[in-house]
Amino acid sequence: MFMSKRTHPVMWIACTLSMLSPALQAASPFPALDRPALQARAPERQVMTAAAQAGDRLVAVGERGVVVLSDDGGRTWRQARRVPVSTTLTAVSFVHHMLGWAVGHGGVVLHTHDGGETWEKQADGMALANAASDAAAEAARRHPESQRAAQDLEAAKLLIKDGADKPLLDVQFTDALHGRIVGAYNLFFETNDGGKTWTSGANRLENPKSLHLYAIRSRGSRVYIVGEQGQLHRSVDGGHTFEALPTPYKGSLFSLDLADKGDVVIAGLRGNAFRSVDDGASWVKIDDAPPVSFISVSAFADGGVLLGNQAGQVFLDRPGFALTALSVPPLFPLAGMVLLKDESLLALGAGGVVRVPLELGKSKAPK
């Protein structure tokens, strides 16, 4: 359950989409995609955006390409030895203690084979744009009368014209070979060879306005993607096909997770969060949350989930119990969070990365 948990920094999405890589590169004559990560004196205090568990190790990523590692449950941190980019990293996923991937601004995809100690660049926005263009051109060739194929081809041409300026916002690998990434403007790519090559899957999504895709999760043959304007895309055949499902909220959905009992939980703007027990066919609102955007959902063993918001508040939702605000030390606005094996919380944001004790067993409040 805990091996590959990761979060992405939805609190920073507005910034992510307004301060894309050209802005980051303006401060230096060397592009951020080619400049190594900032070496920080206290790297764990840099703006951190996402984290994952890699076996017993914790790996967190953040702005300027900073990656930090902890081998004592988040009590102490050290910086990764080599990261080839200084662009902001937004999400990270591990499949076991050695193999992991991170994504970020400029469409960058990084890979580690040594538990996060060193990283290599597998792709960037230009490589992904070329892959999208190839896929769209092939679809247009096969279906010359398809309006959708023609639209996809035009969108792919725009990606190439714009260059590597689109952020990736989430990544999930299910094993050493198979992974998916999503991002702004309907970016959706898949790999079957551990990230060596990527194929666009955007034409499988009903997203004609190219709205942003914020988060992706999968379990078995089911894949879920949430995004801007209440988007929810679901696949029941391992990602071969997707259908757009209606959701009760038409604002942005920033996060989702799959609870151990099979429930799907989605959350987003203004404290809106919903739970489904039937794979997204119907939804029940998680009531009593303040009108502050949820930025992270983290599921745990008994069907419960933790929800974190922009105010630095953490809530517990369990089936059959009322939503409960957990008593935690004052936190900075959260960019992401990860529930640890000992049921402590790893909180990430403008204050860096901190370990927060929780008392989940004392937080039950029957409805």
Predicted regions and their residues:
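N-terminal signal peptide c-region/cleavage motif recognized by signal peptidases
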Residues: S21-A23
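Bacterial N-terminal signal peptides that target proteins for export
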Residues: F2-I13
